[in-house]
């Protein structure tokens, strides 16, 4: 006689074991129809799984994020169902849930085309609209293997042989004649899986190993209702328009090429963006009293072994040999900063010591994961390390948090998700050390009135950390900033200071990054602004255009005045119609377009318009310069008169 306790505290008693679906039906037919799965005593279960003991139960519907992820997983099975109907010879590998959707890896000799994907999507919809029940059957390991052997599903057999114990009881999910294997849960009926779209097909190695066979990975997205699906697809369309790779080419910002995969060739305008970003962060460093240093690009393997990075990162490090010594190009800056700290005796009076670097780092990322500026092999970190005492940790972390928020606000990012990762099972130090460290981070967040989520056990073995994830205009999440306590590296590399009692003590090291990678952050900004950078950041801030040759000298004089005042300005004296010039520089996203005709020249004025076509009228050169200087110095996100 199980007693079921619901989230509101109410209880329901049943004579026999019941399923989540039974409980939902007991509450009401509407909830039964909406029920996708259940969370029983904190564990997700299929709606059909029986509950035989007193339990806490939350009924999962498509209104819950968990429900959406379950229906996405079931859409992957639906995809498998459709594939096997259209190409019975296909072998199904794995079909997991990913952000906003799902995929399935398929072994199929026939190369899937855009037309195939369209036909596959239609077959999926035809199947889903029959509203068939998904039948779950828990079997022995041997029964599962026999079932897939009969079907020739070699990848399912491999999963059973290599990943599942023979004592296990796998769950098989039957979609009419199609059978798949999964830990679940899945939807009870395919009426939940009718708001989806197949997005693309790509190659993927089995098990992610290039020594294995290349499979075809079909990606899809799925949502709880048509409105959510349409919203997502609209966002994807907008994201495609804002793709930094496309805009980077249009605006001549940078390029990449096969001879240097994952390395950026910055062009003049792109490098201007980079330098402005660096200049901005450098000013922040001054405000928060950092030293700026520069460490070597390459160091002996022995140092990386002492730091512990060789054991964990050697596969991702570029190495070279010279004079019988092995060197590694740095994937991070921290060991180099400890070497600088170690030069000369340090006293407690020298702490906190804040050390920052725009460090050029390299990591040997897999070629298949490289993606424009977002995922590169060579990148610049706005990295800093703070050496301090235990008592100073909370204040230093609080300052880091303020620096993060001040910086993100300048770029218009206000939706920041903060997560605090706490002690993992395997860790250095005693519980008292971790209690103090975690409490210092918590109090720093609370003091700054920051809402945060705690991720138990997700910290590094050497200390807890705070992660800052910003959300852009399309509500995409970008994890950029981090504040990480480190109680291990200073000790490993012999960093000490003389304490007030004249004993040698090891400092706490705080790793902190604001932007993370400058290259990646610029990619985010290109997409956030769709190439329409704020004036202070724009590679070219003003372009001055003449209507006829008669104004050419005056236009050049105006540009000279602007340049002397530190405004990035250029002129366009081409013998083209003024409308053509305006359109061209509008496409280049230049913030201010200044037109000069006879009247403007005679009155020592310029006619001002913005790249968005707003006519600001005529102004004297001095008035416009004064206004744009205010625009630039304030780092305004808006143009004049917006």
UniProtKB/Swiss-Prot annotation:
Function: Catalyzes the attachment of threonine to tRNA(Thr) in a two-step reaction: L-threonine is first activated by ATP to form Thr-AMP and then transferred to the acceptor end of tRNA(Thr). Also edits incorrectly charged L-seryl-tRNA(Thr).
Taxonomy, superkingdom: Bacteria
Protein EC: 6.1.1.3
Keywords for this protein: Aminoacyl-tRNA synthetase, ATP-binding, Cytoplasm, Ligase, Metal-binding, Nucleotide-binding, Protein biosynthesis, RNA-binding, tRNA-binding, Zinc
CDD domains given in the database record: TGS_ThrRS, ThrRS_anticodon, ThrRS_core
GO MF terms held by the record: ATP binding; metal ion binding; threonine-tRNA ligase activity; tRNA binding
Free-text comment on the cofactor: Binds 1 zinc ion per subunit.
Family that this chain belongs to: Belongs to the class-II aminoacyl-tRNA synthetase family.
Pfam family, one: tRNA-synt_2b
Subunit structure: Homodimer.
SMART domains: tRNA_SAD
GO BP annotations listed: threonyl-tRNA aminoacylation
Entry binding sites for Zn(2+): 334, 385, 511
Protein name: Threonine--tRNA ligase
Region (Catalytic): 243-534
Main localization of the protein described in the UniProt heading: cytoplasm
One of the record's GO cellular component terms: cytosol
Subcellular location: Cytoplasm
């Amino acid at each position: 006689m199980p007693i079921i306790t619901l989230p509101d505290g109410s209880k329901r008693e049943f004579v026999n074991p019941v399923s989540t679906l039974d409980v939902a039906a007991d509450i009401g037919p509407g909830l039964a129809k909406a029920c996708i799965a259940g969370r029983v005593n904190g564990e997700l279960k299929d709606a059909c799984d029986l509950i035989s003991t007193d339990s806490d139960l939350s009924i999962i519907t498509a209104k819950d994020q968990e429900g959406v992820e379950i229906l996405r997983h079931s859409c992957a099975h639906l995809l498998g169902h459709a594939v096997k109907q259209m190409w019975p010879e296909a072998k199904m590998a794995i079909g997991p849930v990913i952000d906003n959707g799902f995929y399935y890896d398929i072994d199929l000799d026939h190369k899937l085309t855009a037309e195939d994907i369209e036909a596959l999507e239609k077959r999926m919809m035809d199947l889903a609209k029959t509203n068939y029940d998904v039948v779950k059957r828990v079997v022995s390991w041997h029964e599962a293997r026999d079932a897939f052997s009969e079907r020739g599903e070699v990848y399912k057999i491999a999963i059973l042989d290599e990943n599942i114990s023979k004592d296990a009881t796998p769950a098989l999910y039957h979609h009419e004649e199609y059978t798949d294997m999964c830990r679940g849960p899945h939807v009870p009926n395919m009426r939940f899986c009718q708001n989806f779209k197949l997005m693309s097909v790509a190659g993927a190695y089995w098990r992610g190993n290039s020594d294995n066979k290349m499979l075809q990975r079909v990606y899809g997205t799925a949502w709880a209702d048509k409105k959510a699906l349409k919203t997502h697809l609209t966002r994807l369309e907008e994201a495609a328009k804002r793709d930094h790779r496309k805009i980077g080419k249009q605006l001549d910002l940078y390029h990449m090429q096969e001879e240097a995969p994952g390395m950026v060739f910055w062009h003049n305008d792109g490098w201007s963006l980079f330098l402005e970003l660096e200049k901005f962060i450098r000013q922040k460093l001054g405000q928060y009293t950092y030293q700026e240093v520069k460490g070597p690009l390459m160091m002996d393997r022995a140092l990386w072994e002492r730091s512990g990075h060789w054991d964990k990162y050697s596969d991702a490090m570029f190495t070279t040999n010279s004079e019988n010594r092995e060197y590694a190009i740095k994937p991070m800056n921290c060991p180099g900063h400890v070497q600088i700290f170690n030069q000369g005796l340090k006293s407690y009076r020298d702490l906190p010591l804040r050390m920052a670097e725009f460090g050029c780092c390299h990591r040997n990322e897999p070629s298949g994961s490289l993606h424009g500026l977002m995922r590169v092999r060579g990148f610049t970190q706005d990295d800093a390390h703070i050496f301090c005492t235990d008592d100073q940790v909370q204040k230093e972390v609080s300052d880091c948090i303020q620096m993060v928020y001040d910086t993100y606000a300048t770029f218009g990012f206000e939706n920041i998700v903060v997560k605090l990762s706490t002690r993992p099972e395997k860790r250095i130090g005693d519980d008292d050390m971790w209690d103090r460290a975690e409490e210092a981070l918590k109090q720093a967040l609370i003091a700054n009135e920051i809402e945060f989520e705690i991720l138990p056990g997700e910290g590094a073995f050497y200390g807890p950390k705070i992660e800052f994830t910003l959300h852009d205009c399309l509500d995409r999440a970008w994890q950029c900033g981090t504040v990480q306590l480190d109680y291990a590296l200073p000790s490993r590399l012999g960093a000490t200071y003389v304490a007030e009692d004249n004993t040698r003590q090891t400092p706490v090291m705080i790793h902190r990054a604001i932007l993370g990678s400058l290259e990646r952050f610029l990619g985010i900004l290109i997409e956030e602004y769709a190439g329409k950078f704020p004036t202070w950041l724009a590679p070219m801030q003003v372009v001055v255009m003449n209507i006829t040759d008669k104004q050419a000298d005056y236009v050049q004089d105006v540009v000279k005045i602007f340049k002397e005042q530190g405004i990035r300005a250029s002129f366009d004296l081409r013998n083209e119609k003024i409308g053509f010039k305006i359109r061209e520089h509008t496409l280049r996203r230049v913030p201010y377009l200044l037109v000069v005709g006879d009247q403007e020249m005679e009155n020592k004025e310029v006619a001002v318009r913005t790249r968005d076509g707003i006519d600001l009228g005529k102004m004297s050169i001095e008035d416009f310069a004064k206004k744009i200087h205010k625009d630039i110095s304030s780092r305004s996100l808006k143009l004049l008169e917006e």
